[in-house]
A protein has these predicted regions:
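Structural preference for beta-strand elements that scaffold enzyme active sites
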Residues: 139-143, 177-183
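Short, cationic low-complexity segments
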Residues: 165-177
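N-terminal accessory beta-strand-rich subdomains and adjacent acidic, glycine-rich linkers
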Residues: 1-168
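Glycan-processing catalytic domains of CAZymes
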Residues: 179-198
Length: 198
């Protein structure tokens, strides 16, 4: 995580991050579903199991997991507010392919918005040549590497919650478990389990 203590306006042109795992490492990557507008999607896709050196060059959203042998590393974010989420791209260059590097990518800041009346939804019509703006001092998102020796430790890892900003809505006792829409999707990526999924 990084932070700024400037008093005025800050324009963030870009952020650079590259994570080297090794080309033969296996990863689980959820790719964008709209390659022509990769940042405009619903974040709904299955996880593709792939070696890093044969992974698609499409952008993948988080969380993403890499099997490093004795442990798995899941890349996550926390405390993400007024800043674009991090995406990952494999094989951006031959050097990245040889070293098994996942490189960060960020959506550009919207310049002009438009509206789909039939869906009651706005969308980005054009973008700026930077990724974010900010005023005054602030913290930026945490980049998290959750390291687990066993898959069963993944859902119990609470780093995202531990690093998040405190609750801003107050009393949450009114939030109750309930029914969910699209329930037929619940067995999409449960594989290799000893029970019938869904």
């Amino acid at each position: 995580r990084f932070y700024t203590q400037r008093k005025g306006k800050t324009i963030i042109l870009n952020e650079t991050a590259a994570y080297q795992f090794g080309k033969d490492k296996k990863a689980w990557l959820p790719y964008t579903t709209t390659p022509e507008k990769p940042f405009a999607m619903a974040f709904q896709n299955i996880y593709h199991e792939t070696r890093l050196d044969t992974a698609k060059q499409d952008l993948a959203f988080l969380p993403a997991t890499v099997d490093c042998g004795k442990a798995k590393v899941t890349i996550l974010e926390s405390d993400l507010e007024k800043y674009p989420g991090m995406w990952l791209k494999a094989n951006s260059s031959e050097q990245d392919k040889e070293k098994g590097i996942l490189r960060a990518a960020f959506a550009p800041y919207p310049k002009e918005m438009a509206y789909y009346p039939w869906r009651h939804m706005s969308h980005v019509k054009s973008t700026c040549d930077y990724i974010a703006t900010s005023t005054g001092k602030r913290n930026y998102p945490w980049r998290i590497f959750a390291i687990t020796e066993h898959d069963t430790q993944m859902p119990t890892n609470n780093l995202v919650y531990a690093l998040a900003a405190p609750n801003k809505i107050g009393d949450t006792s009114w939030i109750k478990p309930g029914k969910v829409a699209w329930d037929w999707w619940n067995d999409w990526n449960l594989k290799g389990v000893d029970f019938k999924a869904g």
